[in-house]
Amino acid sequence: MSDPVRLDIEDGVATLTLNRPDNRNALSPEMSGAIIDAIDEVEASDEARCLVVTGDEGTFCAGGDVSSMVELMSGTAELHEAVEGIQHETSRAIRRIAEFHLPTIAKVDGVAYGAGANLAIAADITLGSENARISFGFRQVGLAIDTGTSYLLPRQVGVSKAKELVFTGEMLGPAEAEDLGLFNHVFEDDFEAEFEEFIEPIANGPTVALRTSKQSIDQGFNASLKEAMDNEATAQAVVFATDDHEEGATAFMEGREPDFKGE
């Protein structure tokens, strides 16, 4: 059997591909563990400058693995222990995406459902194809939300709309998801080419500056204006010392495009 996750690092882009299309890339404990291991590998790499998360063969991620849950429920473990065990690994995987230090992009071609929808919006940027669909339809299997929905979804669409999407389990098409801000952009013509064009300035950008900016934006949600400014000033002092800042400033003065190395 093939590995549940494929990891490729090329031209600064680490691409993590969920690779269980026969199971619609569901987040089984095995899949979640493989996601975590792959992210650990990217974190240790000197080559990666951004992380792309996608799914194989036209499916992003169908959410929690119901078959694994049923199997554990029928075993000897207590019900709550079985459920917590599955959710723990899935939640860890989604948290690693949300908290990863490099810019992260979810590349959604096909369905992102339940916990799979959380995996998609946990990324910094979510891009969809004309075939992309997204639903927080936990209700369809008689379950409450989990794996970070209560944190991630209201921050994207607001509290009232988040409740509506959860209560109805509505499957959103790409245009609706883009209108709500769940997808940053939808590329309908040539998804692969347009996706590559979009991420190029991220992959070839000033990596230290971008990851520092990401951290500052995340911190800013829970900070006062003064605290945010102080945090930015402290971080900027570090970025000032990078080779990419020197290159950027030099290129600006010389009237040319900078050639950032991510250092």
Please report, for each region that a protein language model flagged, where it lies by residue.
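Terminal peptide-recognition signature
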Residues: L16, R20, A34-I35, V53, ...
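Hydrophobic alpha-helical segments typical of transmembrane helices
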Residues: A82, E89-A93, T149-L152, K161, ...
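Amphipathic alpha-helical segments at domain termini/boundaries
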Residues: M1-T15, N19, E170-I202, T212-G220, ...
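Crotonase-fold acyl-CoA enzyme core
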Residues: A98-L210, A241-T242
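Glycine- (often His-adjacent) and acidic-residue-rich active-site loop
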Residues: G55-R96
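Charged catalytic carboxylate motif
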Residues: E30, A34, E89, R96, ...
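Conserved CoA-thioester-binding segment of acyl-CoA-metabolizing enzymes
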Residues: M1-D56, D244
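Short, active-site-adjacent cap segments at secondary-structure transitions
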Residues: G58-A62, A112-G114, S135, D259
